[in-house]
UniProtKB/Swiss-Prot annotation:
Protein name: Adipogenesis regulatory factor
Signal peptide: none
Expression sites by tissue: Expressed in adipose tissue (at protein level). Highly expressed in omental and subcutaneous adipose tissues. Expressed in heart, cornea, liver, kidney and spleen.
Gene Ontology biological process terms from the UniProt entry: cell differentiation; positive regulation of fat cell differentiation; positive regulation of transcription by RNA polymerase II
Organism of origin: Homo sapiens
Induction: Up-regulated during pre-adipocyte differentiation. Up-regulated following DNA damage induced by UV irradiation.
Cysteines engaged in disulfide bonds, as pairs: none
Primary site of residence: nucleus
InterPro entries per UniProt: ADIRF (IPR034450)
The keyword Calcium is annotated on this UniProt entry: no
GO CC annotation, single: nucleus
Keywords per UniProt: Differentiation, Nucleus, Transcription, Transcription regulation
PANTHER family on file: ADIPOGENESIS REGULATORY FACTOR (PTHR39227:SF1)
């Protein structure tokens, strides 16, 4: 009988350990998913900001060259 009790206890401990490992794995995956999402949002924001800066710089350059062209009578 004692052997049966020890076997049951062993199975219970193994089951509890497996549940703990599964829960830890799920928590780790959630952290990875959140970090991935945060990284993607940061990259999206960086791309947006970079494009806005490029557009602004291009517009400023265009305005500058247009002003120079008008000043020297090259543009109307």
């Amino acid at each position: 009988m004692a052997s049966k009790g020890l076997q049951d206890l062993k199975q219970q401990v193994e089951g509890t350990a497996q549940e703990a490992v599964s829960a830890a794995g799920a928590a780790a995956q959630q952290v990875v998913d959140q970090a991935t999402e945060a990284g993607q949002k940061a990259m999206d924001q960086l791309a947006k900001t970079t494009q806005e800066t490029i557009d602004k710089t291009a517009n400023q350059a265009s305005d500058t060259f247009s002003g120079i062209g008008k000043k020297f009578g090259l543009l109307k």
